[in-house]
Amino acid sequence: MKRASSGGSRLLAWVLWLQAWRVATPCPGACVCYNEPKVTTSCPQQGLQAVPTGIPASSQRIFLHGNRISHVPAASFQSCRNLTILWLHSNALARIDAAAFTGLTLLEQLDLSDNAQLHVVDPTTFHGLGHLHTLHLDRCGLRELGPGLFRGLAALQYLYLQDNNLQALPDNTFRDLGNLTHLFLHGNRIPSVPEHAFRGLHSLDRLLLHQNHVARVHPHAFRDLGRLMTLYLFANNLSMLPAEVLMPLRSLQYLRLNDNPWVCDCRARPLWAWLQKFRGSSSEVPCNLPQRLADRDLKRLAASDLEGCAVASGPFRPIQTSQLTDEELLSLPKCCQPDAADKASVLEPGRPASAGNALKGRVPPGDTPPGNGSGPRHINDSPFGTLPSSAEPPLTALRPGGSEPPGLPTTGPRRRPGCSRKNRTRSHCRLGQAGSGASGTGDAEGSGALPALACSLAPLGLALVLWTVLGPC
């Protein structure tokens, strides 16, 4: 009996304590508060237009998503020192005061996504959140990332910035995020990746940059990403990518480069060579230009396919499936630099020969003379980088100083052979005369006429020899 009485007393004490706690820590009217598994204040989809007052200070989790809250005032959660999870996604947030999250030193997850009217976040909003490891800012209509926005977030591992209106990636934006492993930037309007955009991201494992407007990536942009395993760059405006960009990615396993207007000419050779050695999983890299290689996978081309320049200076026709402007196209490298030749020997398309140009005055065999109104043709003037029979040899074959490329003859034109002593018939001589008559003027003409004259006098010489030996009849 004593044991039963003792057990009943304990149960009664527990009920009384629970009731006292409820009175001491009231729950906001539109919310539900409970203690297991953690002290939680849950107010989702209640039509709230402001952050409710009276949230229990002991709350470890606060769920305010799916309401119509438009403003988060300063110190809204300052009394909730034990807060680790705060969900404010899917509201109508247009303004968050700089000190809205002051005092939340234990906060680990902050979800502000799906607030399309937010646009701008004060650079000091997240200062002091030293334990934050997940931050959702996706679909917030963000136009820019202010300087120092992520300063001090040393514990951050997941950063969601996709589906915003970001139009730039400022240098050093993520410099303090040394523990970041996942960075989502897809679905924005980012036009380029500067040199220090990802500086300090030594732990990054996944970088999603697809569905942007990226047309240029600085050669050193991925320098700190030695641990990166997944890189998505598909559906951008990339026409070429220096192989130097990918060199630091020693751990890369998954690469997607499809849906870009790739130009598969000599400037794609470094990327092609890198892809041949890459042992991870990669998407196709469909060529957009030149037209003869359209829709073919760069990885499956031969090195000999990547010759010449597919895009020359001057007016351009639009590149299919791309959004490149004429200004962006004009910024592309005009042609490939020779490996060993003097840079002065490189002619840009349409540029006349100059005094310092090794090609000055050279007319390759078979070209028409300058007098007919057409000058020498160069390899870069040929359509889509092809080399027609009337074009000059590749510039890489030129020696410094303008000497002839290896393999070209250095002597004058070869003379046509005359009639041999064994075949001195008139038919052979006529053939020889016809062949010599088709040649040009000058030395070539004279050299072809002498054998023909010798053949025509051969019968007369034979008659004189017979007359001398046999005597007159």
UniProtKB/Swiss-Prot annotation:
Disruption phenotype: Mice are born at the expected Mendelian rate, are viable and fertile. They display subtle changes in exploratory behavior, manifest deficits in spatial working memory performance, and show impaired ability to stay on a rotarod. Compared to wild-type littermates, cultured hippocampus neurons from mutant mice display an increased number of excitatory synapses. Effects on neurite outgrowth are controversial and may depend on the mouse strain, cell type, and the experimental conditions. Cultured neurons display impaired axon growth cone collapse in response to myelin, MAG and RTN4. GO terms for molecular function: chondroitin sulfate binding; ganglioside GM1 binding; ganglioside GT1b binding; heparin binding; neuregulin receptor activity. Residues 346-446 are annotated as: Disordered. Residues 448-473 form a propeptide. InterPro entries: Leu-rich_rpt (IPR001611), Leu-rich_rpt_typical-subtyp (IPR003591), LRR_dom_sf (IPR032675), LRR_TM_domain-containing (IPR050541). Keywords: Cell membrane, Cell projection, Disulfide bond, Glycoprotein, GPI-anchor, Heparin-binding, Leucine-rich repeat, Lipoprotein, Membrane, Receptor, Repeat, Signal. A lipid is attached at residue 447 (GPI-anchor amidated serine). One of its GO terms (cellular component) is perikaryon. Residues 27-57 form the LRRNT domain. Residues 434-445 have a biased composition (Gly residues). Residues 260-311 form the LRRCT domain. Disulfide bonds join 27-33, 31-43, 264-287, 266-335, 309-336. Pfam families: LRR_8 (PF13855). Homodimer. Interacts with MAG. Interacts with RTN4. Interacts with NGFR. Interacts with LINGO1. Interacts with KIAA0319L. Interacts with OLFM1; this inhibits interaction with LINGO1 and NGFR. Interacts with OMG. Receptor for RTN4, OMG and MAG. Functions as a receptor for the sialylated gangliosides GT1b and GM1. Besides, functions as a receptor for chondroitin sulfate proteoglycans. Can also bind heparin. Intracellular signaling cascades are triggered via the coreceptor NGFR. Signaling mediates activation of Rho and downstream reorganization of the actin cytoskeleton. Mediates axonal growth inhibition. Mediates axonal growth inhibition and plays a role in regulating axon regeneration and neuronal plasticity in the adult central nervous system. Plays a role in postnatal brain development. This is Reticulon-4 receptor. It comes from Mus musculus (Mouse).
